[in-house]
Amino acid sequence: MVSAASNIDVSNESIIKMEGVDVVFGRNRVLRRIDLNLAQGETLAIIGESGCGKTVLLKTIIGLLHPTRGSVYFDGRDLGRMSEKELNGQRIRFGFLFQQAALFDSMTVAQNIGFSLRQHTNKRAEEIREIVSARVAEVGLPENVLGKKPAELSGGMRKRVGLARALALEPEIMLYDEPTTGLDPIMSDVINELIINTRRQHPVTSIVVTHDMRTARKVADRVIMLFPLSRLKSGEPQIIYDGPAERIDDAADSRVSQFIRGEARERLMEMRRINGR
Amino acid sequence: MRGGPVGAMVDWVADWISDFGAVLLDWTASLGSIAIFVMRTFRWLLGRLPKKETLTPNFYEIGVLSLPVVALTGTFIGMVLVVQSYVQFRNMNIEAKLGAVINMSLVRELGPVLAATMLAGRVGSAMAAELGTMRVTEQIDALITMGANPIHYLVVPRFLACLLLIPSLTIMADFMGVAGAFFYAVYLLDIDMYHYLENSRHFVGGFDLFVGLFKSLFFGAAIALIACYRGFNCEPGAEGVGKAATAAFVHSFVVILVLDLLLGIALDGIYYTIWPEAPKLL
């Protein structure tokens, strides 16, 4: 199978599998019976409106949140059955770009990017410096940012440093949480290009959580759309679209076309109906 | 909703029982959560020590940077004690005994409690705010995704720094308090130096110093655990961080005072078991 977004081979082997995953916080159910398969080398975009559970899904995949019911398998192994040590061992096979980059405030850019290398490898300081410089160049940042603290950087720069940090250990899976949120259109496109380049340079499987259709179309092979549980009828599946990125415009479900066209009128009417106005 | 005054009373009692039950459940859940947090900290502490580059900044921040403020407050507490006690002692013509009472109070009680209070105020609330901010801005999640355990990386170094350095801070508070009291009593109030020192030497022993230092270890551990727990369980937003910092100080201070009382009673018991002939205070 060849990826539509980047002409890269996608294996048919599943690397991440979710089976009947429910996530409940107190009385608030966020995810219901999620079944998902991700093939090795594939880039999946998860779209949906704010609050539908996209980030929760991403955090469940890496074991930051635990499913209330169901299982998440990574490479055929159930994350729920792993000890904390085993889970940490698996996590270093992932790279995670957080929505606000989540850089460590107390460290410089160089220390942030080199953090995993210092924690999990026996590389000498000189080797770590070289890798850090290479990663910074890869995300298109100048060398002089290395000594700066995250607070001194712009939003776009922070995202790129976050990406460089996530790539430091050459992960097998990259998880992007709203990579273009809060950025101007040009910087958003820079980040999209970086996601595509990352895939070209490293053989990674990626999941991109976004509500930016431009990003989803540009970087993903496949798109799934989540729908908020509060607006679903009982028994309706939460994933209302699962298919190739280039065919999302032809989706039969009107809720998908409403979302991708950014149509607010029907949503506003629904909100008014719910609020009794 | 029932009608009549009896019905209203029944409703009020039912509400009260329900609210009380909810508070009790919350407290039990919090206690369980704190216990798990403490156990995980000790498990990591006994399992693998953090790297030197993680420990050093915490030791510097918590120990070295706290020294000046502890020294300053210690000096003033010593002098204030002399000012407050002098008139009463002079009225009884026993002002030369002032050294014994003040130094005993400083070494056994005020030195460790003062050092711990300053640590809780200066370091505890800052730790809670820092970790709270890290929680809110997903930095703790980032640590986890990078395969680092946040308890091992963030809590254990702070716990070790508080535990191992609070005795030094207590010694500093003791020393500066004793020196401040001596200076005020001897040079400003003209109390006879020989008798002041002789009474101090006679009444204050090694066990008193040990009591103060031993208690301080518990205070340091409590401050670090409470502050880190509050930071880790911070509510979202700037308000959550502020609340975590305040709660860290208030809870630490209450726990310091409770521990002070309990340890004071226990250590007195040990003292009179070892030396049954020693004169009793009461």
Language model segments and positions:
Chain A
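Helix-to-loop junction immediately C-terminal to a conserved catalytic motif
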Residues: 62
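Conserved ABC transporter NBD signature motif
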Residues: 70-78
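Conserved ABC ATPase "signature" region
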Residues: 77-78, 125-144
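Short coil-to-helix segment of the ABC ATPase nucleotide-binding domain corresponding to the Q-loop/switch region
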Residues: 106-115
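Conserved ABC ATPase signature
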Residues: 149-153, 157
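Conserved catalytic motifs of ABC-family nucleotide-binding domains
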Residues: 170
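Catalytic Walker B motif of ABC-type/P-loop ATPase nucleotide-binding domains
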Residues: 174-177
